[in-house]
Amino acid sequence: MNTSRSQAIFGAAQGLMPGGVSSPVRAFKSVGGQPIVFDRVKGPYAWDVDGNKYIDYIGSWGPAICGHAHPEVISALQEAIEKGTSFGAPCALENTLAEMVIDAVPSVEMVRFVNSGTEACMAVLRLMRAFTGRDKVIKFEGCYHGHADMFLVKAGSGVATLGLPDSPGVPRSTTANTLTAPYNDLEAVKALFAENPDAISGVILEPIVGNAGFIQPEPGFLEGLRELTKENGALLVFDEVMTGFRISYGGAQAHFGVTPDLTTMGKVIGGGLPVGAYGGRADIMQMVSPAGPMYQAGTLSGNPLAMTAGIKTLELLKQPGTYEKLAATTERLISGIKTAAGEAGFPITGGSVSAMFGFFLCEGPVRNFEEAKATDSERFGRLHRAMLERGVYLAPSAYEAGFTSLAHSDADIEATINAFRESFAVIG
């Protein structure tokens, strides 16, 4: 496979941007080799600058649930862009998308739009503290909530991929108020509440972990967190930047039947454009300026292009049978991956929920980040390179979930499973 142009472009990029990328995981540090430079995307496919075509299971890290460059989304954006790219003023499209989010997500009575998932989590952290008058927060090992200082403690995503314990430049005084517990461990959370009476503002988590690989909540875990937070006067926050509108139209909270106090969102609700949002109970959201004293603002928040793409994407997702199709596609894929690994004699554990999946190259089950570390990262790197050579683009990290879309066909899934079978046979 010729990737000479990708190599040249990435080589030049390293003198222009730190590590040659705008986000660390894209640099292929944990899988080896040089990253592929994309030229265009359409449906379930991506083409690099050398003309190689790939079946894509990253989907821009989650937003492309309808497939890349969906014609109805593109058409809506073409019409909207003629009216301007950013207003910096109230826009009727904000009302439309806000109503759609409020109608869909059980916890959301009011919503504030921002520009990224990180920004949403930063704001919701401040809101938790403002509403409760408490400074401490509980997060879970391996869960990633963006790159804000207080969250870079035993975090997932690129932090996990690069094996970093945290990040230089984060003051100890900032992280002193961040308490951590193993995912799926209610007893550890109980102990933290007991050790910090009347000091914890809330608990924030990915209801399905997607930034330490793919880890599902065990039965009773989310329900237990809901009870513990209520008992201790703390807030429960679901980071649904990844799971929102992907696991179901109402997100993971609708899927599992557990309603948090606050929710952060992003990715899908922007239809591929930069976006984030946080929302929840009206009495809490009324704390946000200008309605209340907790300040948060953004120049490009609620911009008409992101709102337009989000509205059209949610309209497409609301059509009958959408999530049944996504679930069937993803279940077939992960089943085929596990079968192919078994045929090659490799240990594997994994699963899927709706349009989100993942696997670890180790014996299961994997219930938390510590157990996820048992995955064979070196073998995954070889697998990743072998899959690229066979035209399949997976996340360049053993610690990232994968995503399917409405555009992935049965033929795409079959071709992908065959590529896994061939790759497992050659990687050793």
UniProtKB/Swiss-Prot annotation:
Catalysed transformations (reactions): (S)-4-amino-5-oxopentanoate = 5-aminolevulinate
Predominant localisation class: cytoplasm
Residues recorded with modification N6-(pyridoxal phosphate)lysine: K267
Enzyme class: isomerase
Intracellular or extracellular location(s): Cytoplasm
UniProt entry keywords in alphabetical sequence: Chlorophyll biosynthesis, Cytoplasm, Isomerase, Porphyrin biosynthesis, Pyridoxal phosphate
GO BP: chlorophyll biosynthetic process; protoporphyrinogen IX biosynthetic process
One GO molecular-function entry: glutamate-1-semialdehyde 2,1-aminomutase activity
Pathway: Porphyrin-containing compound metabolism; protoporphyrin-IX biosynthesis; 5-aminolevulinate from L-glutamyl-tRNA(Glu): step 2/2; Porphyrin-containing compound metabolism; chlorophyll biosynthesis
Pfam families registered for this protein in UniProt: Aminotran_3 (PF00202)
Cofactor(s) needed for function: pyridoxal 5'-phosphate
EC number assigned by the record: 5.4.3.8
GO cellular component, one term: cytoplasm
Gene3D superfamilies: Aspartate Aminotransferase, domain 1 (3.90.1150.10), Type I PLP-dependent aspartate aminotransferase-like (Major domain) (3.40.640.10)
Subunit text: Homodimer.
PANTHER family: GLUTAMATE-1-SEMIALDEHYDE 2,1-AMINOMUTASE, GLUTAMATE-1-SEMIALDEHYDE 2,1-AMINOMUTASE 1, CHLOROPLASTIC-RELATED
Annotated HAMAP family: HemL_aminotrans_3 (MF_00375)
Family statement: Belongs to the class-III pyridoxal-phosphate-dependent aminotransferase family. HemL subfamily.
Protein name according to UniProt: Glutamate-1-semialdehyde 2,1-aminomutase
Species annotation: Synechococcus sp. (strain CC9902)
